[in-house]
């Protein structure tokens, strides 16, 4: 029998998929990007920060201008205002560097596993610790960022699906995810896995990953 594991910081109820923000308030976690921008990695970053209680919902409301006197305000201002319109996506190396040079007390760890088995194992490792993973998928013609929040294992304890929040798809209403990647079989093509949402299905491969953590000052 298959088993599903979702990070424990999120819950699904009649309002939607929610997490507690930095203020301890239950807020909707999924953020959907615009049709014209390529800032899927920034949306995934914001969702990761929300479900790890690094920011509050009010911090990211439209027309809410960040207070640049604080480290958090400087961080949000940099990504929301100084970076401008992101059309062609964000390189994870550059994104990690931008995060880590900010004064806000979080850090980004850029992971580049060499094989798909290593990538799946890394996602499992962090989901087991209830830490979401920003993952990059590549497809024929482009790349897309998602937030991995859960996994499915079969009766032999083999991972068969990676459950994600996709900023490019509608918010989930009846499950804790709005996208999954079927990794039960690895095809022989350049794009060996199926990516599935309610509006799209196409073949992808897994690529770089980002882990967002609180800085440890011990």
Regions found by a protein language model. Name each.
Residues 24-111:
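Cysteine-nucleophile protease catalytic domains, especially the papain-like/related folds used
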Residues 1-34:
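Flexible propeptides and autoinhibitory/regulatory segments associated with cysteine proteases
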Residues 92-107, 146-152, 177-182:
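Hydrophobic transmembrane alpha-helix bundles
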Residues 151-218:
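Noncatalytic regulatory segments and standalone regulatory/sensor domains
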Residues 10-14, 23, 66-69, 119-122:
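Membrane-targeting and insertion segments and their boundary/processing signals
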Residues 112-164:
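Active-site-adjacent substructure of cysteine-protease-like catalytic cores
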Residues 7-20, 71-77, 179-187:
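Charged, glycine/proline-rich intrinsically disordered loops and linkers
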């Amino acid at each position: 029998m298959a088993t599903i594991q979702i990070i424990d910081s999120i819950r699904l109820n009649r309002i939607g998929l929610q997490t507690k923000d930095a203020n301890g308030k239950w807020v909707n976690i999924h953020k959907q990007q615009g049709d014209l921008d390529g800032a899927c990695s920034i949306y995934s970053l914001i969702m990761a920060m929300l479900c790890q209680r690094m920011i509050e919902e009010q911090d990211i409301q439209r027309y809410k201008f960040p207070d640049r006197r604080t480290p958090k305000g400087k961080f949000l201002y940099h990504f929301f205002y100084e970076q401008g319109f992101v059309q062609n996506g964000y390189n994870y190396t550059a994104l990690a560097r931008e995060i880590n040079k900010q004064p806000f007390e979080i850090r980004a760890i850029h992971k580049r596993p060499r094989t798909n088995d290593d990538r799946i194992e890394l996602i499992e490792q962090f989901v087991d610790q209830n830490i979401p993973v920003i993952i990059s998928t590549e497809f024929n013609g482009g790349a897309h960022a998602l937030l991995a929040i859960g996994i499915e294992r079969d009766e032999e304890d083999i991972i068969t699906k990676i459950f994600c929040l996709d900023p490019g798809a509608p918010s989930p209403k009846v499950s804790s995810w709005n996208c999954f990647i079927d990794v039960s079989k690895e095809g022989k093509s350049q794009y060996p896995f199926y990516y599935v949402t309610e509006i799209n299905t196409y073949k992808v491969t897994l690529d770089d990953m980002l882990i967002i953590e609180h800085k440890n000052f011990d």
